[in-house]
Amino acid sequence: MSKYLSPKLETVTPYTPGEQPQDQQYIKLNTNESPYLPSPAVVAAVSEHEVEKLRLYSDPACTDLLKTAAVHFGLQPDQIMPGNGSDENLFFALRAFCDETHPLAYADITYGCYSVWCGLMHIPSHIIPLKEDFTLDPADYYGLNETIVIANPNAPTGLALPRSAIEGVLKANPDNVVIVDEAYVDFGGESCVPLIDRYDNLLVVQTFSKSRQLAGARLGLAMGSASLIADLNRVKFSLNPYNINRLTLKAGQAALEDAVYFEKTRAAIVDTRAWTKQQLEARGFAVLDSRSNFLFTSTQKKNGGELYHKLKKKGVLVRHFDAPRIENWLRITIGTPEQMQIFLNTLDKIMEE
């Protein structure tokens, strides 16, 4: 670091994203991207005509996308705010609803950016351990005088709470915002969007990166009461009014409108997940009951870090977290059936060594 860096940032540990290799071809099962191409409707929407408009700023109000999203989710446009990826939505939420005297409560094993953002903004963290089986006990979040964020389904475990459990947390914290990070909800979770009109302290965040094949476009949605969304827009318009580029606005709108393609690819991933889970269990691996587009798995026969490195050496990328309680587990993104067969064949060779 340079001598000019603010002392407040010297102790911040930045987030470590999953590998994005540029120099070698891998079976890439490490960052929970979709293995399928974007919808043909998206390709058509991002036309040459739209490319020519890149000389102009995008619509800061995201008008057309909001109209489409409002119809899709059964909300009003003023209950939704698009973000440059759901990460931006979440960051804005922490900026709006937390500060140095108002902590953020979250699980010890969950999305790593929560702790990074707390460090960056000097927000106290209240870290709540998951149970021994990696499930989250909603009662641990009752009656906290803190902002709460729950990834549901959780990452990297893939486990999900029913909507009723989240509702219990909302009821027990009427004076604090409860953020539900639903990045993976389309693969088997139960969305809390239907609760928005009943709880003005609920903020739901979803992404287009996983189930709508737009990870590279960077688009997320925050959904909640009109007053919560107004708070987020206060942050947005104080930082970057043009946060969504023109092509992403068109791509996101088209992705929401193509329900047939969404369901086809979503179902394919869920089916492949079930088959892969069965195959891993037949090989003696422990596999959590994922409701996401990945599996969290371990074996007593080999160390998780060792498996990760050997798979990478043989051309298969998965995710390993060198962290307490999960150092022997791997997170494996669900790819196409062909990709998962290659993964399993490679795994078999390693296990025979």
For each predicted feature, which ranges?
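PLP-dependent aminotransferase class I/II
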Residues: 201-281, 285-288
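Conserved PLP-binding catalytic core of the aspartate aminotransferase-like
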Residues: 270, 282-314, 330
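Active-site phosphate-binding strand-loop segment of PLP-dependent enzymes
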Residues: 130-186
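N-terminal "arm"/small-domain region of PLP-dependent enzymes with the aminotransferase-like
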Residues: 1-56, 71, 143-144
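Phosphate-binding glycine-rich loop
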Residues: 64-103, 121, 301
